[in-house]
Amino acid sequence: MQAGSWVVGGGDSDSRVLSIQSHVVRGYVGNRAATFPLQVLGFEVDAVNSVQFSNHTGYAHWKGQVLNSDELHALYEGLKLNNVNQYDYVLTGYTRDKSFLAMVVDIVRELKQQNPRLVYVCDPVMGDKWDGEGSMYVPEDLLPVYREKVVPVADIITPNQFEAELLTGRRIHSEEEALAVMDMLHAMGPDTVVITSSDLPSPRGKDYLIALGSQRTRSPDGSVATQRIRMEICKVDAVFVGTGDLFAAMLLAWTHKHPNNLKVACEKTVSAMHHVLRRTIQCAKAKAGEGLKPSPAQLELRMVQSKRDIEDPEVVVQATVL
C-alpha cells in the first residue's frame, strides 16, 4: 500500500501528503506538529487547516476561526481545477464536525480513485481515559461516521485504547483482548493498526505504558501475513499537547521507509517521540524554575530543536514481536 520513493540522508521524495488538521499561530498541534517533521523527512506537505486558532485550547484563552465542510470542499475544488490534486498520502486528526468529517471521506475516496496506491493515515481522535474512566471530547454523533465511513477507507489508524474500544464496541482488559480488537479493526478496513497507549499493566512497572501494533501484509499469491508488536514506553510526568499529531505524522513517514516492518517503523517513531518529549520537559522545567509547574506555553513541543532526532532517531525503545 506504500507509494513513492524515499532515500535516507538525501534526495527528494516523490511523496506528497495532504494533511487536513488544525492550525495554531503559536505552538505545535495539528498541522503545526505534523508538517515540520514530514518535511524534515523528505515529504511535500499540502496543509488544509481545519481550524486556525491563536494557540491550543489548553491555554486560558484562545481565539480563531473554524473551517466548515463547504469551505473545505471549495479548497479541494481549487486544487482539482488546477489539476494539482495528486497525492500519495492523506493525513487527518482532530475533527469536531460530522459534515466536515464526511467531506474528508469524500475527498479520500476521490483521491483513491485517482491513485489506488494512496495511503490514508487517520488518527481517530474522539476521547481518552483518565483514572480508568473513558470519556469523549468530540460530539457523540462522530462515532458512527468514524465506524461506518472513515475507518473503512483508512489504511493506517492510530487510536488510543479508549478510541479502539469505541470503534469496535469491545472493552480491553488484557493483551489478548487488545489483539482481538486490532483484528476487528483490520476487518473494518485498515491494514495497519497501532493502539498508541493503553492502561494495560507493564511488566516493567507503573512508570511504563503499553502500546500495541498490528500490520497485515498481502503477498502476490493472495496470502496474508500479520506482524504484531508490543512496546513499553516510559511515562513522562507532564501533560503535552500535539503528541498524537506528531506520532501519526512520523508513523506515516517511517512506515513509508519500512513498508512491511511495523516493528522498525514503530521503534523509530516512538524513539523520536521520546527524544522530543525529553527535550521539551527539560526545557520547560528550566524555564519554569525549580519546584514550579511549567505553563502550557513552556510545554510546547521543542520541535525545531529536535530536528536531528526526528531525522535520524537513536532507537531507545525496542518493540517485541508477539
From Swiss-Prot:
Activity is increased in the presence of K(+)or Na(+). Keywords: Acetylation, ATP-binding, Cytoplasm, Kinase, Magnesium, Metal-binding, Nucleotide-binding, Phosphoprotein, Sodium, Transferase, Zinc. Disulfide bonds: none annotated. Pyridoxal binds at S22, T57. ATP binds at D123, N160, Q161, F162, E163, T196, S197, V236, D237, A238, T243. Pathway: Cofactor metabolism; pyridoxal 5'-phosphate salvage; pyridoxal 5'-phosphate from pyridoxal: step 1/1; Cofactor metabolism; pyridoxal 5'-phosphate salvage; pyridoxine 5'-phosphate from pyridoxine: step 1/1; Cofactor metabolism; pyridoxal 5'-phosphate salvage; pyridoxamine 5'-phosphate from pyridoxamine: step 1/1. It catalyses: pyridoxal + ATP = pyridoxal 5'-phosphate + ADP + H(+); pyridoxamine + ATP = pyridoxamine 5'-phosphate + ADP + H(+); pyridoxine + ATP = pyridoxine 5'-phosphate + ADP + H(+). GO terms for cellular component: cytosol. Transmembrane segments: none annotated. Pfam families: Phos_pyr_kin. Divalent metal cations. Zn(2+) is more efficient than Mg(2+). Na(+) binds at D123, T158, T196. Belongs to the pyridoxine kinase family. This is Pyridoxal kinase. It comes from Sus scrofa (Pig). The gene is PDXK.
